[in-house]
């Protein structure tokens, strides 16, 4: 029972004979929460059962609060993607794994074009609608092993393990088309607007390159994409 996730925290109340101390002690050692001795008093049984139920509910609330606190610390509240803090700590681990195994790792920085204009024209609520829908489209365009996060404002980062620059470029282009090809509903669906993105791509060189340098090269590629007219993907070689 304790070995199964779904029953691990279920309270266990044991009933023992008065002379069976060894079994009672063994039960407590393996996870029994409380016990009663025969003959059973129904009032005592009900009281002990209610106590264990209260303890279980309190422990469940504590676990939920801890889990919620952890999620809030690593998740962007608006989009539901990982936040910058989580990305920066996890990226180092992914880069170390890629370098030690001699495997490719690609990174892209995505920026929503003219996002300030969206806020100025349609309001900040519309801007939030765009960010949320953008996050949804990111999730549908990447794999489970990829790491997507909101980097800040209208910038997002996607880290793709086991992915070379050619494959990452195809993923980036597919994502760019999915954004530009379908309008975004804003202001509770009362209006639909066109949105485009610019993407900068870079890959880890597997020669001990700091991850900060990979991010910098992706950012330079993003700058080129925006400088060259936006709504495009630009990659930079390692």
Region spans (language model):
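Alpha4 helix (beta4-alpha4-beta5 surface) of REC/receiver domains from two-component response regulators
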Residues: 3, 8, 17-34, 145
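Alpha-helical scaffold within the catalytic cores of cyclic-nucleotide enzymes
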Residues: 135-136, 167-185, 217-219
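Short regulatory alpha-helical coupling segments
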Residues: 70-71, 84-104, 135-143, 161
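Short catalytic/binding micro-motifs of nucleotide second-messenger systems
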Residues: 97, 140-145, 177-190, 203, ...
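Conserved nucleotide-binding and Mg2+-coordinating catalytic segments in signaling enzymes
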Residues: 70-89, 110-124, 132
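C-terminal output helix
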Residues: 39-49, 167
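A short pre-motif secondary-structure segment
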Residues: 147-150
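Catalytic-core segments of nucleotide cyclases and related cyclic-nucleotide turnover enzymes
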Residues: 165, 169, 204-238
């Amino acid at each position: 029972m304790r070995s199964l996730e779904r029953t691990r925290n279920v309270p266990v109340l044991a009933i023992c004979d008065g002379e069976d101390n060894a079994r009672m002690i063994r039960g407590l050692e393996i996870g029994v929460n409380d016990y009663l001795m025969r003959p059973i008093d129904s009032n005592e049984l009900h009281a002990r059962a209610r106590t264990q139920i209260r303890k279980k509910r309190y422990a469940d609330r504590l676990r939920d609060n801890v889990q919620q606190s952890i999620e809030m610390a690593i998740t962007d509240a608006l989009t539901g993607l990982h936040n910058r803090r989580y990305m920066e700590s996890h990226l180092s681990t992914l880069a170390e794994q890629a370098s030690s195994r001699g495997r490719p790792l690609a990174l892209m920085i995505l920026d929503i074009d003219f996002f300030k204009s969206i806020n100025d024209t349609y309001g900040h609520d519309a801007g939030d609608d765009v960010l949320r829908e953008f996050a949804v489209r990111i999730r549908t365009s990447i794999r489970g092993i990829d790491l997507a996060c909101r980097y800040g404002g209208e910038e997002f980062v996607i880290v793709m393990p086991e992915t070379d620059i050619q494959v990452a470029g195809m993923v980036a282009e597919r994502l760019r088309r999915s954004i530009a090809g379908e309008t975004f509903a804003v202001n509770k669906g009362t209006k639909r607007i066109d949105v485009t993105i610019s993407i900068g791509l870079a890959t880890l060189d597997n020669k001990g390159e700091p991850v900060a340098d990979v991010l910098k090269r992706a950012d330079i590629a993003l700058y080129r994409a925006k400088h060259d007219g936006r709504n495009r993907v630009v990659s930079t070689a390692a």
